[in-house]
C-alpha cells in the first residue's frame, strides 16, 4: 500500500504558478483524504520559468525521490515538452541507475521520455495519469473511471486489469475558479475497437505519447532532442521491442493526420512494427481525427496480421486508466479486457 507520495515537475513547472494554486489545493486535499503523506520535491513548485531554466534541478528532484527510502510513489505533476533535457544529468555518470529503487512511478504525455529513461535502467512504471491533470480535476470529484484506477494503484501497488469506460468527456474549456465543482457532461463511449488482426494477444506494454516519440526523430520542436536521444540510446532497439505491445496515444496538440502519419512512418523505420506483438492506440482528445487515425494505423503499419486495437481510455482524452509498463499483459478485444500478470 502506498503511504508517502513525492510530486515532481520533470517537464512543465505550471504547478508553481500563483494562478493555479486553487487547483493544486484541490489535488492536495484529495490525496490527503486517501491518508497519503504528500511531499513536493524541492523544485517542483518553483514555477514555469525556473523549472524550464533548470533541467539539472528537475533531475536532482527525481534522483532524491528515488533515494529516499520513505517515498513509495513518485507522481509527476504534469507533462510538458522538454524533459529530454534531463538526460545528461541522469546518465552521464550512471546517476539514475545508481539511484533507482523499486517505487511506483506514474505520469504520462511528455513523461513518456521519463518512462523510457526508467525502462533503460530496468524499472517497471505506470502510464496514464498525473497530479495536475487528474487529481486536481475541477469537478466535484475525480472522474469515476480515473479515480477507480488511481485508488487501485495506491491500495495495491499495481493494476490487475483494464476495461473500457462507459463514457468520455470533452476537454474542459475553462480552468478558472468559477469552474470548481462543475461536472463535465458525459458522452457514451463504445469500448475497445479491434481494427485488424487476432483479438487476443500478449506482451509487455511500452510506449506512450506519439508526439513525444515523434520528437525523438524530428528536431522541429527542439533541434538537440534527436541528438541527445541518439547519444543516450533512449529509444529501445528492435530486439528490445521483440514481443512487446506498443502503446500510442496522441497529445492535446491534436496532431493533424499528416503529422500522425509522419510519426508512424518514423516509428516504422525503426523496425518496431516488425517486432511487436500488437499495437494499442488511445482515444484522441475530443475524438479529433479519430477516423483518420484509425485509417492511418492500418495503412502505414501495413501488417495485416498485426493486432491493432483503438479507442483505449489512455492518454489525453478523459477519463484515463493507468497502464502498467513492463508487466506481462493479455489483451482480449472480444471480451473487452486487458489482464496483467505479476
Which role fits each region the language model picked out?
Residues 73-75, 106, 245-249, 280:
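Structural motif
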Residues 67-91:
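Long, hydrophobic/aromatic-enriched structural stretches that serve as scaffold segments
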Residues 259, 265-268, 278-342:
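ATP/nucleoside-binding phosphotransfer catalytic cores, i.e., glycine-rich phosphate-binding loops
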Residues 205-251, 255-257:
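Oxyanion-binding "anion nests"
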Residues 21-24, 55-59, 92, 260-266, ...:
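Charged helix-capping and loop-helix junction motifs
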Residues 126-211:
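Conserved anion/nucleotide-ligand pocket segment
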Residues 92-120, 124-132, 307-308:
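Short, acidic/small-residue loops that bind anionic groups at enzyme active sites
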Residues 1-70:
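ATP/NTP phosphate-donor binding region
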Amino acid at each position: 500500500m502506498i503511504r508517502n507520495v513525492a510530486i515532481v515537475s520533470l517537464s512543465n513547472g505550471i504547478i508553481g504558478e500563483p494562478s493555479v494554486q486553487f487547483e493544486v489545493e484541490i489535488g492536495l486535499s484529495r490525496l490527503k483524504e486517501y491518508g497519503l503523506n504528500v511531499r513536493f520535491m524541492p523544485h517542483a513548485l518553483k514555477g514555469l520559468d525556473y523549472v524550464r531554466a533548470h533541467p539539472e534541478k528537475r533531475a536532482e528532484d527525481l534522483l532524491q525521490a528515488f533515494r529516499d527510502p520513505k517515498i513509495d510513489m513518485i507522481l509527476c505533476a504534469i507533462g510538458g515538452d522538454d524533459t529530454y533535457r534531463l538526460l545528461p544529468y541522469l546518465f552521464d555518470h550512471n546517476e539514475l541507475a545508481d539511484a533507482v529503487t523499486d517505487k511506483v512511478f506514474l505520469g504520462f504525455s511528455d513523461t513518456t521520455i521519463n518512462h523510457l529513461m526508467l525502462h533503460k535502467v530496468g524499472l517497471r512504471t505506470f502510464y496514464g495519469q498525473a497530479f495536475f491533470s487528474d487529481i486536481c480535476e475541477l469537478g466535484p470529484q475525480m472522474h469515476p473511471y480515473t479515480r477507480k484506477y488511481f485508488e487501485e494503484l495506491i491500495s495495491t501497488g499495481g493494476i490487475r486489469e483494464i476495461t473500457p469506460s462507459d463514457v468520455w468527456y470533452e476537454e474542459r474549456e475553462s480552468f478558472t475558479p468559477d469552474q470548481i465543482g462543475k461536472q463535465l457532461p458525459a458522452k457514451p463511449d463504445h469500448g475497445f475497437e479491434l481494427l485488424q488482426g487476432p483479438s487476443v494477444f500478449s506482451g509487455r506494454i511500452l510506449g506512450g505519447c506519439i508526439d513525444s516519440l515523434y520528437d525523438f526523430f524530428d528536431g522541429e520542436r527542439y533541434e538537440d532532442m534527436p541528438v541527445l536521444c541518439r547519444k543516450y540510446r533512449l529509444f529501445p532497439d528492435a530486439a528490445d521491442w521483440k514481443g512487446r505491445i506498443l502503446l500510442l496515444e496522441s497529445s492535446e496538440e491534436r496532431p493533424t493526420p499528416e503529422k500522425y502519419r509522419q510519426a508512424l512512418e518514423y516509428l516504422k523505420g525503426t523496425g518496431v512494427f516488425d517486432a511487436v506483438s500488437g499495437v494499442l492506440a488511445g482515444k484522441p482528445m475530443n475524438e479529433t481525427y479519430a477516423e483518420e487515425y484509425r485509417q492511418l494505423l492500418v495503412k502505414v503499419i501495413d501488417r495485416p496480421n498485426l493486432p491493432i486495437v483503438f479507442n483505449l481510455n489512455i492518454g489525453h482524452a478523459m477519463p484515463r486508466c493507468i497502464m502498467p509498463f513492463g508487466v506481462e499483459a493479455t489483451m482480449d478485444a472480444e471480451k473487452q479486457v486487458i489482464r496483467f500478470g505479476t
